[in-house]
Amino acid sequence: MERDCDIVDLDQPSLGTVISIKDGSTPTDISTTSSTTEDKLCSGCGCLIKDRYIYRVMEDSYHESCLRCSCCQLSLSSFKKCFSRHGNIYCEHDHQMLYGKRCRRCMTLLLPTDIVHRVHFMYYHAQCFSCCSCQRPFNLGDEYHVFDGEVFCRNDYQSICNFQTISNPDPLMEEVVRSEIHRKTPKRPRTILNAQQRRQFKTAFERSSKPSRKVREQLANETGLSVRVVQVWFQNQRAKIKKLNKKDSDSGDTFKHGPGSEGRSTEDIRSSDDEEESVINLDADEVETSETSSYTDPIQKLYNMTSSQIYFPYHS
């Protein structure tokens, strides 16, 4: 966490050197010597230099016509200084364009006369130093935070941390948090219960599967969750119990639908399940994924039917 920012003048010798020359780029003075004393090979064309004068750049020798910028092919014989990088020769302008420092926000070149803000390895124009999310400019003394290579104000950084704590407790899921920073549409929150909260919910469910509002509010205060989350959990739990009971009833050998039997039909049970399922899916908070009704084997259903339910056509 950074609590203030550094203002750096690129005219200073320390940063002036960094901006104009870095990573092997070496400014060299171009000197000329007489070629009468010894023969030299041109580093540009590879031919023997027989001219009256030899142009030297560091340890290399050039013809006057061969000493050119590798980018724009400008003749450097009339310049007092050039730049060498990875065996290539550049004029000052092209070297700045290719290897000069750039503003992190607008990506334009930083000039030696610019006043810039430096944050770790990043550089910003004074007018470009602002929050990546809300675009609010920073002033001297303002608190800012660096996350994923971007600068955020305190409020936006707190929002990112809260989102990471609620939706992604696992630090290995940091990539998901990064993608959510630039989302335009909000994502539905998902509540994950810990072991203590699950035990409290199960204990309350054993007492009553449909607790009153007062009990739900008390349970919400004890667990630190909202009343709506508590209500959704009980709805999901009742739906699961109902499904398991229905599955056991369909697979049991003693369960039979006689002419005088009481109870709801299969259509009534499916309709009730669909109704409760719709209530769960319309909630804004998701506690656990609700399960759909199980599939009943038609052969097993036929096996459980009594003879009075099976129609035998009369044959004369």
Swiss-Prot record:
GO biological process: axonogenesis; defecation; detection of chemical stimulus involved in sensory perception; foraging behavior; negative regulation of gene expression; neuron development; neuron differentiation; positive regulation of gene expression
Any GO MF annotation of the entry: RNA polymerase II transcription regulatory region sequence-specific DNA binding
Known function: Transcription factor. Required for the terminal differentiation of sensory- and motor-neurons, especially GABAergic neurons, and for morphological aspects of uterine development. Plays a role in the cell-type-specific regulation of glutamic acid decarboxylase unc-25. Involved in promoting sleep-like behavioral quiescence, acting by modulating expression of transcription factor aptf-1 in the single sleep-active ring interneuron RIS. Plays a role in regulation of RIS differentiation.
Compartment annotation: Nucleus
Protein name per Swiss-Prot or TrEMBL: LIM/homeobox protein lim-6
Gene name linked to the record: lim-6
Coiled-coil ranges from the UniProt annotation: none
Positions of region (Disordered): 244-297
Source domain of life: Eukaryota
Domain LIM zinc-binding: 40-101, 102-163
DNA-binding region positions on the chain: 186-245
One Pfam short name: LIM
Biased composition (Basic and acidic residues): 246-256
UniProt keywords, alphabetically: DNA-binding, Homeobox, LIM domain, Metal-binding, Nucleus, Repeat, Zinc
Signal peptide bounds: none
UniProt-listed PANTHER family: LIM HOMEOBOX TRANSCRIPTION FACTOR 1 ALPHA, ISOFORM B (PTHR24208:SF166), LIM/HOMEOBOX PROTEIN LHX (PTHR24208)
InterPro entries referenced in this protein's UniProt entry, alphabetically: HD, Homeobox_CS, Homeodomain-like_sf, LIM_Homeobox_TF, Znf_LIM
Any single GO CC term annotated in Swiss-Prot or TrEMBL for this entry: nucleus
Biased composition (Acidic residues): 273-289
